[in-house]
Amino acid sequence: MFTGIIEDLGKINKLEKDGGNLQITVSTSFTNELKIDQSVAHNGVCLTVVGINGDAYTVTAIQETLDKTNLGNLKENDSLNIER
């Protein structure tokens, strides 16, 4: 359950287009505690962890999410408010 309290500032390591979707790879201080299929909020947008590699994890934002949030405007090395 999300608390509304920002737990960490994540850093975008990589952005990769996948059709109309966007794969977002993020590093954060608690990546080692995450699990595949876990929900994590990014700038208030709940996304599901689809991959974990070292100190970074990957989520997918679909086109509708990109159209209705600021996630489509992000660039590599930008910071994200992270809540879990």
Regions found by a protein language model. Give the residues of each.
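Conserved loop->alpha-helix
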Residues: 1-84
